[in-house]
Amino acid sequence: MKKMPMRKRFGQHFLHDSFVLQKIVSAIHPQKTDTLVEIGPGRGALTDYLLTECDNLALVEIDRDLVAFLQKKYNQQKNITIYQNDALQFDFSSAKTDKPLRVVGNLPYNISTPLLFHLFSQIHCIEDMHFMLQKEVVRRITAEVGSHDYGRLSVMAQYFCDNTYLFTVSPQAFTPPPRVESAIIRLIPRHNFTPVAKNLDQLSHVVKEAFSYRRKTVGNALKKLINPSQWPLLEINPQLRPQELTVEDFVKISNILN
């Protein structure tokens, strides 16, 4: 079967290292009864491993040439469904069976952040997620309060999920090699976060507004939203910088606006 060319506009870097692939599958630990969804399967390197472990696998691929390639490669497989679709627009609940989805993939680095936010909006139908991402993005997702990497993505990802940095992947594991290191992350949805955000759009707006002015105090950064008399009610020091606020702090700010 002929090789498929990479398309730069899709941010394609195909994983080929068998040791890394086995390590990823070990981290996912798929079960026969799982419903797995793989985003951006490429030529099917990870797919091949997953098919041996899982009886229900869905692939979401935007590249029509790769879709044709995958359809031909897996035309004898009965336990696989291929969707030609943009993952940023895909309704993940449409792939759901009687069990929550386990979502995996080597996410295109040029759309990884908006794709994560799209997945957060459908978190109710997801059991867990294992992704290959740019190492810098994984560091931001898992960043601690007060650190340089802590920001909007950290707050929103940590509101929706418990996140674990699993391991780093060298550029040499890909064809062509990306210019940056990659990392594998596990995200497990949190369905009982306390306090609960009353309005998720409001929470996202507050967090985005605050980190647009991360060098300012949070009192100044959010002065269009919060008046000075509200800070004592929130029990938050308005002289703190946005990166010094916890996820819980941002939820409290969001909730007082509703």
From Swiss-Prot:
Family: Belongs to the class I-like SAM-binding methyltransferase superfamily. rRNA adenine N(6)-methyltransferase family. RsmA subfamily.
PANTHER family: DIMETHYLADENOSINE TRANSFERASE, DIMETHYLADENOSINE TRANSFERASE-RELATED
MF terms (GO), sorted A to Z: 16S rRNA (adenine(1518)-N(6)/adenine(1519)-N(6))-dimethyltransferase activity; RNA binding
Class in the EC hierarchy, top level: transferase
Binding site for S-adenosyl-L-methionine: 13, 15, 40, 61, 86, 106
EC id: 2.1.1.182
InterPro entries xrefs: KsgA/Erm (IPR001737), rRNA_Ade_diMease-like_C (IPR023165), rRNA_Ade_Mease_Trfase_CS (IPR020596), rRNA_Ade_methylase_Trfase_N (IPR020598), rRNA_adenine_dimethylase (IPR011530), SAM-dependent_MTases_sf (IPR029063)
Protein name per UniProt: Ribosomal RNA small subunit methyltransferase A
Name of the gene: rsmA
Enzymatic reactions: adenosine(1518)/adenosine(1519) in 16S rRNA + 4 S-adenosyl-L-methionine = N(6)-dimethyladenosine(1518)/N(6)-dimethyladenosine(1519) in 16S rRNA + 4 S-adenosyl-L-homocysteine + 4 H(+)
Cell compartment(s), UniProt: Cytoplasm
Keywords: Cytoplasm, Methyltransferase, RNA-binding, rRNA processing, S-adenosyl-L-methionine, Transferase
Organism: Coxiella burnetii (strain CbuK_Q154)
Pfam families associated with the record: RrnaAD (PF00398)
Stored HAMAP family: 16SrRNA_methyltr_A
Function recorded in the entry: Specifically dimethylates two adjacent adenosines (A1518 and A1519) in the loop of a conserved hairpin near the 3'-end of 16S rRNA in the 30S particle. May play a critical role in biogenesis of 30S subunits.
Listed GO CC annotations: cytosol
